[in-house]
Regions:
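Glycine-centered coil/turn sites that cap beta-strands in beta-rich domains
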Residues: 214-239
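Active-site acidic/histidine clusters and adjacent loop/turn architecture
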Residues: 58-94
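Basic/polar, cationic surfaces and motifs that engage anionic cell-wall
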Residues: 17-69, 107-119, 123-217
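Short secondary-structure junction motifs
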Residues: 99-101, 173-175, 233
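Short beta-strand-plus-loop segments that form exposed binding edges in beta-rich domains
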Residues: 1-6
């Protein structure tokens, strides 16, 4: 869990003096992708506090990042709600941030929680938050640390794959851009060795999940003059 970050300049937009610049202080509209949105526990459901200030919105999307909380393990929905609320409280009142730093959090039962709206800039990779959607696994996955020896559950894995597949499809990102927190500046062990070693597998599984929606076999339609070839009623069979 790191600092909200330093000032970062990712791009400069220049407009002619007689041209009105586009409004960047609003959410980019998601596209209508083919991948269904997974079930996500809303902020209202886990009792989120309001952000302290207005959000800043992503001007584009080009990064995906996986974290671990390095604490706050949760094995069911009620534990997950409590831990997500604790993390928000720590980020807002311990770190002094605007809101919880992550966009999504996933517990060990596979429940997915909404953090900040994914259309707004988070606070999860200092110096690389713009365009970056961050997901945090509740728990601790770095074995050298005391009480930090967890491995990912099948339920968490499935939710991570489905969540990043939906995010990739909806916001036009390739699964190949998925990184662990440590891959940016090397100043942290996050997401822990037990998760970081899984990243190539995650990228492949997310790609396969997305591809499966574009390779579904076509539906064949057969017209059958049943029961009477001279009847106006037609029976259609779908294979």
């Amino acid at each position: 869990i790191i600092s909200e970050g330093n000032v970062e300049v990712n791009s400069v937009l220049i407009f002619p003096v007689d041209q009105e610049k586009p409004e960047l202080a609003r959410a980019l509209e998601p596209t209508l992708g083919d991948i269904p949105k997974p079930v996500i526990i809303s902020r209202e459901e886990w009792g989120a506090e309001e952000p302290k200030n207005s959000y800043s919105y992503h001007p584009y999307f080009d990064r995906l990042t996986l974290h671990h909380a390095a604490c706050c393990s949760a094995d069911d929905l009620e534990e997950g709600k409590a831990q997500v609320y604790w993390i928000q409280d720590f980020h807002q009142n311990g770190r002094g941030w605007n809101d919880i730093g992550y966009h999504f959090l996933v517990d060990r039962a596979g429940n997915i929680y909404q953090g900040r709206p994914e259309t707004v800039i988070g606070a999860h990779v200092g110096g690389a938050n713009t365009g970056n959607i961050g997901v945090c696994l509740l728990g601790c996955y770095h074995p050298p640390e005391v009480s930090c020896f967890q491995t990912i559950t099948p339920e968490s894995r499935q939710s991570i794959v489905e969540l990043f597949s939906w995010v990739s499809d909806t916001y036009g990102q390739s699964p190949t851009v998925l990184l662990g927190h440590r891959d940016y500046f090397g100043t942290t062990a996050c997401p822990g060795d037990n998760i970081w070693i899984e990243l190539p597998i995650f990228r492949a599984e997310i790609s396969d999940f997305i591809q499966s929606y574009f390779e579904m076999p076509p539906i064949s339609i057969f017209q059958s003059p049943y029961p009477n070839p001279f009847s106006s009623q037609i029976t259609l069979s779908f294979d």
